[in-house]
Amino acid sequence: PGKSSEGYKDLNLKEWFFKVHWPGDPNMPGMLQIEALTQISSLSILTIPGNKGEIMYLVSANDLVFKKKIIPGSRFFMKSDVISFKRGLATFKAKGMVNDELVCSATIKLVLPKEIKQYKII
């Protein structure tokens, strides 16, 4: 908690997005990859004692890199490291891998509303 988080998703041809992205060349949409990295990132903060049941909101996703397609039958492994967490704002470096090869990465910023409410923002 508070340092890093990781997880994976086994993808099969029955995933709804493979039917439409793209017919004849099914692969996981980039924005769903970023969504998965964002959700994994949030776990680093939401597992800190006192944050159970809280939610985080996406502030930004930058430095997006998509290197390879993620196809049916892949295990999409995600890892996220907390770069900073101050005043309710968290910054993460996240990456996705398939077969130990980097397939995507991003710098993600999330906000924890219960924390940021106590600071006056102009």
Locations of the language-model features?
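Compact, glycine-rich, soluble single-domain proteins
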Residues: 22-29, 34-43, 58
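HotDog/MaoC-like acyl-thioester-processing domains
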Residues: 1-3, 70-74, 81-122
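Short, low-complexity, polar/charged sequence segments that are solvent-exposed and flexible
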Residues: 14-15, 24-29, 53-55, 77-78, ...
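Catalytic strand-loop segment that frames the active site of acyl-thioester-processing enzymes
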Residues: 1-28
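Hydrophobic beta-strand-centered segment that forms part of the acyl-chain substrate-binding groove
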Residues: 40-79, 103-113
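Short, hydrophobic/aromatic-enriched beta-strand segments in well-ordered soluble domains
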Residues: 9, 79-82
